[in-house]
Swiss-Prot record:
EC number: 1.2.1.38
Pathway the protein takes part in: Amino-acid biosynthesis; L-arginine biosynthesis; N(2)-acetyl-L-ornithine from L-glutamate: step 3/4
One GO biological process term: L-arginine biosynthetic process
Family: Belongs to the NAGSA dehydrogenase family. Type 1 subfamily.
Organism lineage: Bacteria, Bacillati, Actinomycetota, Actinomycetes, Micrococcales
Protein name per UniProt: N-acetyl-gamma-glutamyl-phosphate reductase
GO CC terms in record: cytoplasm
Keyword Ion transport on entry: no
Amino acid sequence: MTFSVAVAGASGYAGGELLRILADHPDFDIRTVTAHQNAGQPLAAHQPHLRSLAGLTLSESTAENLAGHDVVFLALPHGKSGEIATQLPADTLVVDCGADHRLEDPDAWAAFYGGEHFGSWAYGVPELPVGAGRQRERLAGAKRIAAPGCNASAVSLALAPGIHAGLIEDADIVSVLAVGPSGAGKALKTMYLASEILGSANPYAVGGTHRHIPEIQQSLRKAGALSPTISFIPVLVPMSRGILATSTARVKPGVSAAQVQAAWEETYAGEPFVQVLPAGSVPRTSDVLGANTALIGVALDAAAGRVVAVLAIDNLYKGTAGAAIQSANIALGLAETAGLSVNGVAP
């Protein structure tokens, strides 16, 4: 069976990555592409690399244009997805790549986003430990899915094994991320100009203001944390796409380096898209470019009494579009790996 697909926000980076992956998916047929400001223009004017889809024309991002498809992917700014989603049929699988349906706590939404809280949907990080199982069990058969924030999934996947195994403390977590500017979207902003980025590293949203903080805390609570606190520092670096998240947490007394390595390996054993590197190895962003793969290196800093977990993902692939499509595969009962690449692009 082939499922008809519509993608809203198709002229942006996340929308373009969705289309790039979906174009070669064996079970999905792209029927409609929409973009509010660019309606009426050819898709090729905004996504010239998608040659197999060059004949498509962008239409308005309205519920009327999106309804009638089996699957709708929303790659819209926060606030916009929630408005449209309420108008779509209940039997349509809707996957929101924006923030509108990630947070369960309306107070956290009000504090970090503001505006109307549209409620939470099944969270699209299948590998996340939840109780005795995984988040994928909550995605099976779902009709509404919230794809994760790219930074949030990077930190959560990096630290969840230690939380779940009871090896690390959930207070005093520190995460420093090197991130590419594509995570901020295509909208023109001075700080993302090449002349501002090249040859520079630029911290932003410092001091506990980044919107992915409550999402990370929510995921770590699902993994077993009681009251997680995190100092989260993203740093904009001159690479178009990619995240290298270095996260540290206090280790509990008596935990050995072997126990740490084993906990991470056991948590992700058999996972097709999350791989733990051998002890002593750390990942690079170049190793996951263009792949739905997360690579993790973990070590015990015995002198500091902390575990250090380093995770690399492609923010547009595994961090956004790949996670959305992986979750949709699960919801529809397809092979979880369908249409998704585990191999990166090099050089």
